[in-house]
């Protein structure tokens, strides 16, 4: 009976251990690293090295947890795979650190006495709960590398779109200059820059269309001059360029060529053309107001003059004289009657 009770207790303890092992999550978080545990797997190091995997370190460690955490703490290289062997092969060496640049570069195979750990950069779950944005992207994980590249491409496209939409020209310079082409003039000739990359080619075509519109309005622009009496556009720096000759109006001074200076705004586009339209509309409004005011003033003057003339004409009549004349006539008639 005693032996049977001991056997039952041992079975219960083993079942509890298996249950707790199955309930434990294979993923843990440690020092900005997500560590995923895969028991029963190991790596074929020779074949993996042929495909681009990099062997980092092979040493002795007490537990698999320490082996995986030491891989996470490596700062010199990106360690994203650790293998812990329960039964060391030789000289008590049981911990292996490997860097896999891609998923296909590391070949896995089953192994009963080994545990494979996949280490990836991550964010503290507490920070995720409090909705704090990450300050870095995942660079350790080979599985998330393509996602990172896609994110970077999307961010670059957004920045390019914002930059192009925000780079509408705002001009501030002396009003005597009207030449607006993006040129660098040395000896009565200007050189326009032609960019080689696709993005800069699109930007150049867009900038040319914008320059054409500005030339129709003919505003003035700022420029930046260097000690060699050359003007340099603030958005173009020396990049593999080709020079093409363009004619320059003879009335312009070669030492005072002006270039477009565009100022980008994230929330709105502000151009000198809009300023000209606003000034034209304001001038038209002022002219109309002045005309209306002058017409009203002239009307008031005419009314005042007319009323004054009417008053003068009415003032020439003398009703008293009429009354006195009629009285004299009556008196004369009365005297004639009396005399008769």
UniProtKB/Swiss-Prot annotation:
Coiled coil: none
A biological-process GO annotation: extracellular matrix organization
Pfam families per UniProt: MANEC
GO molecular function, one term: serine-type endopeptidase inhibitor activity
Keywords, in A-Z order: Glycoprotein, Membrane, Signal, Transmembrane, Transmembrane helix
Domain MANSC: 37-117
Chief place where the protein resides: membrane
Region (Disordered): 320-340
Glycan-modified residues: 118, 187, 260
Topology term for the membrane: Single-pass type I membrane protein
TM segment ranges: 285-305
Position of the signal peptide: 1-24
Cytoplasmic side: 306-340
Keyword Protein biosynthesis: no
Localization terms from the record: Membrane
GO cellular component, one term: plasma membrane
Extracellular side: 25-284
Stored PANTHER family: KUNITZ-TYPE PROTEASE INHIBITOR 1, MANSC DOMAIN-CONTAINING PROTEIN 4
Name recorded for this polypeptide: MANSC domain-containing protein 4
């Amino acid at each position: 009976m005693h032996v049977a009770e001991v056997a039952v207790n041992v079975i219960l303890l083993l079942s509890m251990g298996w249950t707790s092992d199955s309930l434990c999550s294979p993923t843990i978080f440690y020092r900005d690293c997500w560590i995923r545990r895969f028991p029963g797997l190991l790596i074929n190091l020779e074949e993996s090295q042929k495909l681009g995997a990099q062997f980092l370190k092979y040493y002795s460690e007490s537990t698999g947890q320490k082996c995986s955490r030491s891989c996470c703490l490596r700062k010199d290289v990106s360690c994203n795979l650790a293998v812990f062997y329960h039964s060391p092969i030789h000289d008590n060496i049981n911990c292996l650190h490997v860097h896999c640049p891609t998923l296909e570069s590391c070949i896995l195979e089953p192994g009963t006495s080994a545990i494979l750990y996949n280490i990836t950069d991550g964010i503290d779950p507490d920070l995720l709960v409090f909705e704090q944005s990450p300050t870095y992207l995942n660079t350790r994980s080979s599985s998330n590398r393509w996602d990172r590249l896609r994110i970077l491409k999307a961010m670059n496209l957004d920045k390019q779109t914002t930059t192009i939409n925000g780079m509408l020209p705002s001009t501030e310079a002396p009003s005597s200059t009207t030449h607006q082409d993006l040129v660098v003039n040395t000896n009565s000739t200007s050189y326009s820059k032609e960019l080689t990359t696709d993005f800069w080619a699109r930007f150049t075509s867009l900038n040319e269309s914008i320059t054409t519109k500005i030339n129709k309005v003919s505003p003035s622009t700022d420029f930046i001059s260097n000690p060699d009496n050359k003007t340099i556009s603030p958005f173009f720096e020396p990049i593999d360029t080709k020079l093409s000759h363009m004619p320059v109006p003879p009335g312009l001074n070669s030492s005072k060529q002006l270039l477009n200076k565009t100022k980008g705004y994230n929330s709105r586009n502000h151009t000198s053309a809009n300023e000209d339209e606003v000034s034209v509309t304001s001038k038209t409004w002022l002219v109309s107001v002045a005309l209306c005011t002058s017409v009203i003033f002239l009307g008031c003057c005419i009314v005042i003059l007319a009323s004054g003339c009417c008053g003068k004409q009415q003032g020439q009549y003398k009703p008293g004289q009429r009354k006195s004349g009629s009285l004299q006539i009556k008196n004369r008639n009365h005297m004639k009657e009396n005399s008769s």
